[in-house]
Amino acid sequence: MWLLRCVLLCVSLSLAVSGQHKPEAPDYSSVLHCGPWSFQFAVNLNQEATSPPVLIAWDNQGLLHELQNDSDCGTWIRKGPGSSVVLEATYSSCYVTEWDSHYIMPVGVEGAGAAEHKVVTERKLLKCPMDLLARDAPDTDWCDSIPARDRLPCAPSPISRGDCEGLGCCYSSEEVNSCYYGNTVTLHCTREGHFSIAVSRNVTSPPLLLDSVRLALRNDSACNPVMATQAFVLFQFPFTSCGTTRQITGDRAVYENELVATRDVKNGSRGSVTRDSIFRLHVSCSYSVSSNSLPINVQVFTLPPPFPETQPGPLTLELQIAKDKNYGSYYGVGDYPVVKLLRDPIYVEVSILHRTDPYLGLLLQQCWATPSTDPLSQPQWPILVKGCPYIGDNYQTQLIPVQKALDLPFPSHHQRFSIFTFSFVNPTVEKQALRGPVHLHCSVSVCQPAETPSCVVTCPDLSRRRNFDNSSQNTTASVSSKGPMILLQATKDPPEKLRVPVDSKVLWVAGLSGTLILGALLVSYLAVKKQKSCPDQMCQ
């Protein structure tokens, strides 16, 4: 970093000092373009110049180099229009350094000085922001799959491969129009303040109806496509028209618009169908208000992809009991039966296993407990009814939200709740608790997509939303705990435990005995006190 500062300081200092002893040489005009991956720097000779300029650059050690085509160092020199020279240097070039969120490259123009000695006649520090949004080069499938007759020019020829791909377009040196749009959506935000949006019909499946693609906020003739082929449609319009919105935040101005398309509807004698999803394309260009430069951000927002195709297959479910409220670990098969005290909390989790579809949602329909492994056996006690806590229990079930975590990438595949342990009562003997195991069971189903209104419901008297919509569910399945729970009475009864009735005669005898004992203790205490307070001769 110190060396870089020294190099920059030396370059700046040489500019100031050499200004006094600068040899007579033609002035040059130059233009810098910050591309997605490289500098594009064009130097133009004025009319007095007799020879093309020679470009030079300083490396990180401060050494001077004449620039030439060097793929190892990421520099290319080509002749531009007229007598101009164009330099293209990648941001990973040997002569480029990262500095204060920018890529910088000190360059110069070399000319003839006194006695025909070569001297640096012009110096410039190329500087491009690092956060300039880079467009990905189109995939080869997006380019090769377009027939030559359907290709829509992206930029006029001649143009280099780097410049073309820097625009997010396809390149073919064998074609007359060497730079053309790929099978996708390509957005350009121009320095002059225009949108340029190219849409391929194959950006969706089935393909788009191109003649139905239009701007959502304005549909007059001035906002119609400027060019169309069988495979593409191209919109170009200024930021001040076609319903474009502008929002200024600090130093940034954001211009936004939206494209929509009509669905392809097939009409039959008994109804109409469509196989198209909704097409809505949101585009955005951001500019710096205080700088007359290229856009600082270009974004295309498409709707989420359609849900993946489903196939029939087994759905594996699991009901587990966690060892604590954090759900950090669970009881395994070898840990059962789980021994708990009455009124202890039990933390339950029901999960979908071996699925990676983020759109799946797990629904708990009914959950209940039985004294045997048979979920249909009697007696039964309801825990959840239609996914909500059973309101007839004075210790109501608590629904626990599931948060996304590193070990839980699909929270919609899990449902959690806690219950307070209880014991079944013998129906033949009044208020006699049945001793033995308690098994948990749940009936569950799956809905899609998860966390949408069709998959949630608000439980009565609860603010928490629960999954519930029979129209979006598959067949209900059942799952049970891996083993039973053995419930024990606590060694110390809680305050609300029922009192045992006691005979009044027993209470009377106990009270009289307590009174006599207290009286004897009082007499003994007074005697001892009197003995300590009197002199020995008087107490004898």
From Swiss-Prot:
Xref: PROSITE patterns: P_TREFOIL_1, P_TREFOIL_2, ZP_1, ZP_2
Alphabetized InterPro entries for the sequence: P_trefoil_CS (IPR017957), P_trefoil_dom (IPR000519), P_trefoil_dom_sf (IPR044913), Zona_Pellucida_Domain_gp (IPR051148), ZP-C (IPR055355), ZP-C_dom (IPR042235), ZP-N (IPR055356), ZP1/4_Ig-like (IPR054554)
Gene Ontology biological process: acrosomal vesicle exocytosis; binding of sperm to zona pellucida; negative regulation of binding of sperm to zona pellucida; positive regulation of acrosome reaction; positive regulation of humoral immune response; positive regulation of T cell proliferation; prevention of polyspermy
Tissue: Expressed in oocytes.
Places the protein is found: Cell membrane
Extracellular side: 19-505
Lineage: superkingdom: Eukaryota
Record membrane topology: Single-pass type I membrane protein
GO cellular component, one term: plasma membrane
Residue ranges annotated for the P-type domain, each copy included: 141-183
Post-translational modification (record): Proteolytically cleaved before the transmembrane segment to yield the secreted ectodomain incorporated in the zona pellucida.
Domain comment quoted from the record: The ZP domain is involved in the polymerization of the ZP proteins to form the zona pellucida.
Record protein name field: Zona pellucida sperm-binding protein 4
Gene: ZP4
